[in-house]
Amino acid sequence: MNELTRTFFNSSVHDTDPLIAQALDDERARQKNQIELIASENIVSQAVLDALGHEMTNKTLEGYPGNRFHGGGQFVDVVEQAAIDRAKQLFNCGYANVQPHSGTQANLAVFFLLVKPGDRILSLDLAAGGHLSHGMKGNLSGRWFEAHNYNVDPQNEVINYDEMERIAEEVKPKLLITGGSAYPRELDFARMAQIAKKVGAFFMVDMAHIAGLVAGGAHPSPFPHADIVTCTTTKTLRGPRGGLILTNNEEWYKKLQTAVFPGVQGSLHSNVLAAKAICLGEALRPEFRDYVAQVVKNAKVLAETLTSRGIRIVSGGTDTHIVLLDLSSKGLNGKQAEDALARANITSNKNPIPNDSPRPAEWVGMRLGVSAATTRGMKEDEFRKLGNVVADLLEAESAGNGPEAAEKAKVTVRELTEAFPVYAH
């Protein structure tokens, strides 16, 4: 082995790329020392990290187990088949495609399968908690299809199923979509399936945010009501970045294989498939049900604590991991609130709420999520404490005393992160 080869195979990132090494070290420290309250984030297990950094990342493959376009894929076949089998068992469905690189890629594959350019789709309005890949104009789905929206009731901010039915009868969509990125309430899949059937639409559920809750029995399953289901393996599933597509329709499944490859993707990410299989296996264990039950308890406590401090919670509470705040009564916008929490080492994100401004700079909403902090082991007492810290920070920001309050809050955050640490390294 010559020196160049020896260096290539044996040098760490700290040896070869100080800039990136420093960024990686800084990110590790950030995750260790900050409390993550972004609803779309979680913390993966060490086993998932092991898979993501494995040599399997070197293997290029196209096709499916037993039917590949490249040789040497026998061990990737093992992990992909395990991921398929575990997904089917976890979500009690007949067929699973585990190759999508993301939830949006999974959605695109379903569109490729079920609808044609110009067809009508009906989905939850983005400001009401929907997702950009469900027909937003800035997304390909909004350019390819004639997108229409249903909304939440202006009084209780919960999906108005009667109004959804009225719109569906008027629009006659080819595809009815539910799910999104900021809807905190339980979804009535049975009612929506009835609406879809009544108007002759396919019914698709994007459960990216609630997949872990469904898997652990903390939210009703979209099966047997949905025709097809997509999700991510991140968020409440605590896995790597990637997507899944699930169905009970054998004919669709066969067509779905080609919709994913070569329809919207090329080669698969072999190491990510291994990580997906691991996280799905973790979700099949009894302790995962305990985890998601705690997630919902923690979210409810956080919402109740913030409400008791005079902060309005959209829809009056939550049934999931998401708590959506209306900051207008505090005279703040979402970015100001996000910055106020960030100064105290709490990460969050601004978010639109129902009937919010279309301009992100003017959004008055903030989305909080409890999944990552629950993974660290925090329970109700910690979330009462966190809720009061968040309320203190928002009140101080509104009064012009944000930086001073942040210094005090940092002490509590440090106590919590030290009491509930992450990885040993």
Swiss-Prot record:
The record marks T234 as: Plays an important role in substrate specificity. It catalyses: (6R)-5,10-methylene-5,6,7,8-tetrahydrofolate + D-alanine + H2O = 2-methylserine + (6S)-5,6,7,8-tetrahydrofolate. Pfam families: SHMT. InterPro entries: PyrdxlP-dep_Trfase, PyrdxlP-dep_Trfase_major, PyrdxlP-dep_Trfase_small, Ser_HO-MeTrfase, Ser_HO-MeTrfase-like, SHMT-like_dom. Keywords: Cytoplasm, One-carbon metabolism, Pyridoxal phosphate, Transferase. It is found in: Cytoplasm. GO terms for cellular component: cytosol. GO terms for molecular function: D-alanine 2-hydroxymethyltransferase activity; glycine hydroxymethyltransferase activity; pyridoxal phosphate binding. Optimum pH is 7.4-8.0. Inhibited by hydroxylamine and sodium borohydride. The keyword rRNA-binding does not apply. The modification N6-(pyridoxal phosphate)lysine is found at K235. Its cofactor is pyridoxal 5'-phosphate. Pathway: One-carbon metabolism; tetrahydrofolate interconversion. Catalyzes the reversible interconversion of alpha-methyl-L-serine to D-alanine with tetrahydrofolate (THF) serving as the one-carbon carrier. Cannot use alpha-methyl-D-serine, L-serine, D-serine or L-alanine. PANTHER family: SERINE HYDROXYMETHYLTRANSFERASE, SERINE HYDROXYMETHYLTRANSFERASE 1. Belongs to the SHMT family. This is 2-methylserine hydroxymethyltransferase. The gene is mshmt.
